[in-house]
């Protein structure tokens, strides 16, 4: 949201406001823990939470987990790539997202449906992640996963969507894909 405010302020010629919100739009860097390579909650002393598990669904992350919310820097993909150590490391992390499957003991929330590894297509915060392979010059992986989702998670039946339609987002993803 901060980045959007900055862009609007810039278009309106409000440089001071734009600069403030561009700076705020980089705050995601403050919760990136290089030791775990995830965005991670901090405690009241500013230290990263010690018992953090990226695949856990906790009160610190709304309707998702650390794997799914890591990629929520849509306004600065190049910055996120840089945080992870470059395109090769970023692509490896993407690969892990799609291959690190929940265990049989994991109690997934109701909204975590359409799972491919930690990617939850049934919950909208993941929808853009498949396309991030394009940013690291591996478009064939985007194409492979998009085809998989379209062919396996959208069915010609009353239960045709694998998740919550949320104002048409599931259908819109399909149409745009």
Predicted features, each with a name:
Residues 1-177:
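Active-site core of glycosidic bond-cleaving carbohydrate-active enzymes
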């Amino acid at each position: 949201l901060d980045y959007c405010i900055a862009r609007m302020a810039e278009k309106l010629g409000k440089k001071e406001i734009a600069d403030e919100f561009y700076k705020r739009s980089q705050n995601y860097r403050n919760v990136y823990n290089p030791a775990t390579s995830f965005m991670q909650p901090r405690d009241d002393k500013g230290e990263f939470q010690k018992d953090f598990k990226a695949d856990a669904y906790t009160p610190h992350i709304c309707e998702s987990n650390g794997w799914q919310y890591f990629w929520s820097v849509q306004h600065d993909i190049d910055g996120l790539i840089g945080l992870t150590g470059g395109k090769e490391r970023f692509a490896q992390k993407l690969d892990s997202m799609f291959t690190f499957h929940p265990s049989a003991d994991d109690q997934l929330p109701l909204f975590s449906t359409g799972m491919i590894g930690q990617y939850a297509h049934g919950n909208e915060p993941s929808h853009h992640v498949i396309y991030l392979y394009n940013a690291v010059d591996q478009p064939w992986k985007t194409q492979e996963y998009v085809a998989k989702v379209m062919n396996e998670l959208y069915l010609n039946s009353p239960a045709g969507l694998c998740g919550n339609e949320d104002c048409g987002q599931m259908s819109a993803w399909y149409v745009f894909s």
